[in-house]
Amino acid sequence: KYSTMIYNIYLKYVAPEDMHVYSIDEVFMDVTDYLGIYHKTPYELAMTIIQDVLSQTGITATAGIGTNMYLCKIAMDVEAKHIAPDKDGVRIAILDEQSYRRKLWDHRPITDFWRVGRGYAKKLEEHGMYTMGDIARCSIGREDEYYNEDLLYRLFGINAELLIDHAWGWEPCTIADIKSYKPERN
């Protein structure tokens, strides 16, 4: 019930093609094209939407603002937890690639990061890597050094590519990519 109500509030601000429902209580929005329309910064637009949700449902929200979907997710899941809530309990965190590296490259535990579970963490720890900064530094190691991109690919196969991207705060997938995806038919 509340999930539908909240989604309908989002639709007042953003078209469905610019939203990706990630879970029952989590939505990604690409608001890039809306900032000029509403004459708002990303923070101001997030606060407007959150205040609308709060006034209509009584539910307080947290928002993560980022330059890509990964940074939005990390801003919400990791960074927002360290921000004091406002008078309504709202927390909004903002990350770009530089602030991510500055604030979170040394963050522990590494399992706080999207798509890094206990299995990945254990493999990384066995090779002396405990943070996203460690992964990023490993990815640029020279060929003749132990810590280099090849080590990550040996440990994680093709999944190393996304792990390396995320270590640097990069995310190649966009909401438009998700919306345009068509699964292959057998």
Where would I find each of the regions flagged by the language model?
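Long, highly charged, low-complexity intrinsically disordered interaction regions
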Residues: L45, I49-T111
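Catalytic palm subdomain of template-directed nucleic-acid polymerases
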Residues: F28-I50, G128
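Residues that scaffold, gate, or flank divalent-cation-dependent active/transport sites
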Residues: K1-I24, F28, D165-A167
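Generic non-transmembrane alpha-helical segments
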Residues: M5, I9-Y13, T48-T57, K123, ...
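DNA-contacting surface of Y-family translesion DNA polymerases
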Residues: D112, Y120-N186
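Short, conserved phosphate-binding/catalytic loop or strand-edge motifs used
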Residues: I24-D30, T67-C72
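Flexible, glycine/proline-enriched loop segments at strand-loop-helix junctions
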Residues: D33-K40, V90, L104-D112, Y120-E126, ...
